[in-house]
Amino acid sequence: MNKPGMITMLLMTSLSIASANGIDSLLAGYRDDGAAGFSAVRGKLLWTTARIIDGEQRACSSCHTADPVAPGKHVKTGKPIEPMAASANPERFTDMAKTEKWFRRNCKWTLGRECTPQEKGDLLTWLSGQQE
């Protein structure tokens, strides 16, 4: 393998590890908040279930697509959104404050309220299992 290829591979590996560590840290925090038994099945259901909020049908997949390894697009602004799955976007979930900020904002828009620690853990459990 050539040197640039090896450097790229090492960088991607370190980003994957950072993402996994970020998810593990977030899940530990949700457990500290009383959540337990995270479920990928519940996470997927939360991701794909549409709800009517303020007269509009909304789901996580409205902006992020049903396939979290694919890029999305904001339904109102058209702004591109990087893939949610860490396998497709290794920097995803490495910044805990940023992750919490987006959970707060997106849960309020999608669910009409903030997500519970259990819901966040379920979503992260499902998202962390999605592979390219």
Residue ranges and their predicted role:
Residues T8-S16:
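Bacterial N-terminal signal peptides
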Residues N21-D54:
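Electrostatic cytochrome c docking/interface patches
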Residues F38, T94, K98-W102:
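Generic alpha-helical secondary structure signal
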Residues I81-A97:
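Short microdomains enriched in Cys/His and/or Lys/Arg
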Residues E100-E132:
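C-terminal capping alpha-helices of c-type cytochrome domains
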Residues G72-K79:
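Short cysteine/histidine-rich zinc-coordinating motifs and their immediately flanking basic loops
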Residues G55-D67, L123:
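The canonical Cys-X-X-Cys-His
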Residues M1-I7:
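Bacterial N-terminal signal peptides that target proteins for export
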